[in-house]
Design a protein with these regions (language model features):
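N-terminal nucleotide-binding beta1-loop-alpha1 segment
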Residues: 1-30, 35, 39-40, 46-52
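Short internal beta-strands
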Residues: 52-58
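Acidic helix N-cap motif at the loop->helix transition within catalytic regions
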Residues: 63-69
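Short mixed-charge
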Residues: 69-93
């Protein structure tokens, strides 16, 4: 049985560029009735077992997203558990909003940088609290991707495993092939990307 690790969910919004040309922010695009793309990513992070969720959105979009998403979500695995007192067994996952640092805007302001900055922010805040809550793994969910979310539950232990990174794939292609599909990375991968 794998050991429990702290996995932080990273949802990059800052630096997102699409060609949809609509009035609403692209992450607010509906993907189902009453379900926006950003809500899909938050639910996905909760479904795979993230203990915290970090949305990297600059100050222009963060209030809109916070109004839609909120500040926490129930873990779907614990929420769906049939027990005598279900409300006592529910687990809340906090959602944090982080803007890209002003010194990095218009210099290192890209979609990839918002992923790295989200991971850095999650680590920095946790380091100030306690070494016991430091993220050991990061799960990246892209709001503009679509796939079967309930199927991720079957891979929950594999995704949270310390042993290897997890990549979703489509036709044999992953994020390494520039597809915006979810993946995980650890602290060593983060250091390699920053250098």
């Amino acid at each position: 049985m794998p050991q429990h690790i702290h996995m932080a969910g990273i949802i990059p919004v800052a630096g997102l560029e699409t060609d949809f040309n609509q009035q609403l922010p692209d992450v607010m695009m509906p993907v189902d009735v009453g379900f926006a793309a950003i809500q899909k990513s938050v639910y996905e992070c909760a479904m795979v077992g993230c203990q915290t969720i970090w949305i990297v959105a600059n100050n222009d979009l963060a209030p809109i997203i916070r109004n839609t998403v909120g500040e926490w979500i129930y873990d779907p695995v614990y929420y769906e558990t049939k027990t005598l007192f279900p409300s006592e067994n529910r687990k809340e996952i906090p959602i944090y909003y982080v803007p890209v640092h002003p010194n990095d805007r218009d210099k290192r302001d890209s979609y990839g940088w918002s992923i790295l900055y989200g991971a850095y922010s999650a680590w920095l805040v946790a380091a100030k609290i306690s070494k016991w809550v430091l993220p050991e793994k990061y799960y990246v969910s892209f709001p503009m991707s679509a796939y079967d979310l309930p199927s991720l539950r079957t891979h929950r232990l594999e995704i949270a495993s310390r042993d290897a990174n997890f990549f979703l794939s489509y036709d044999g292609k992953t994020v390494k092939d520039e597809l915006p599909i979810a993946f995980t990375f650890n602290g060593e991968d983060f250091k390699a990307c920053r250098n």
